[in-house]
């Protein structure tokens, strides 16, 4: 059995997190300004690699906690991204997850340490690799899910007004519509 595994190629299994927040009527995305290669100085999603002793879901929770200090956050798997040349460093297949967090509850020092910044979803800079595709798919999933389940509450503080709730759901709908309008 060992020969079967050793005769097949190996590659990395990555995790990329699309972290959404809501502030002042706008959906924002937590992005990393990379201070490491490949693509140093470029904008990316927060990511990491699955370790031998963890599931992909546990790896996503770990990556999110390492960046934000938050645990028990709403997360959903977006999908697998495995184009052969998606990462110029090595052969990497990535599983993307999106997370919805209250923008006022994360560890600001930890985020600064990772050189991460909140960016309005409708004003995103160019992202590396296939990260734009991940964001697009996550936005579509979030909009779809928000239309049938109350997932938006994860983006709001414990106490909120009805106008904040309305503003949130309008922002979820408008941000996705805005994206689609610019693609055509």
Please tell me what each predicted stretch does:
Residues 19, 34, 99-101, 118:
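Hydrophobic side chains in beta-strands
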Residues 177-184:
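Conserved small/polar residues in nucleotide/adenosyl-binding loops
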Residues 26-70, 147-171:
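Conserved Nudix-box catalytic region and its N-terminal flanking loop in Nudix hydrolases
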Residues 2-43:
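N-terminal strand-loop-strand
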Residues 173-175:
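Acidic, proline/serine/threonine- and glycine-rich low-complexity intrinsically disordered segments
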Residues 11-15, 57-61, 65-108, 123, ...:
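Active-site segment of metal-dependent pyrophosphate-handling enzymes
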Residues 98-99, 107-146, 155-168, 180:
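NUDIX/MutT-family hydrolases
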Residues 29, 34-36, 40, 47, ...:
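Short, His- and charge-rich active-site/binding loops that engage polyanionic ligands
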């Amino acid at each position: 059995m060992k020969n079967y595994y050793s005769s097949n190629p190996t590659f990395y299994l990555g995790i990329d997190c699309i972290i959404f927040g809501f502030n002042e009527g706008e959906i924002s995305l937590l992005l990393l300004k990379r201070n490491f290669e490949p693509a140093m100085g470029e904008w990316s999603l927060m990511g990491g690699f699955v370790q031998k002793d963890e599931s992909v879901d546990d790896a996503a929770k770990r990556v999110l906690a390492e960046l934000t200090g938050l645990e028990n956050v709403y997360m959903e798997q977006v999908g697998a991204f495995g184009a052969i040349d998606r990462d110029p460093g090595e052969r990497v297949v990535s599983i993307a997850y999106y997370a919805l967090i209250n923008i006022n509850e994360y560890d600001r020092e930890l985020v600064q340490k990772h050189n991460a910044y909140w960016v309005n979803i409708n004003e995103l800079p160019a992202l590396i690799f296939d990260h734009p595709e991940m964001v697009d798919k996550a936005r579509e999933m979030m909009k779809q899910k928000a239309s049938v389940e109350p997932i938006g509450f994860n983006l709001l503080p414990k106490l909120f007004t009805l106008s904040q709730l309305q503003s949130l759901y309008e922002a979820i709908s408008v941000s996705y519509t805005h994206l689609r309008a610019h693609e055509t």
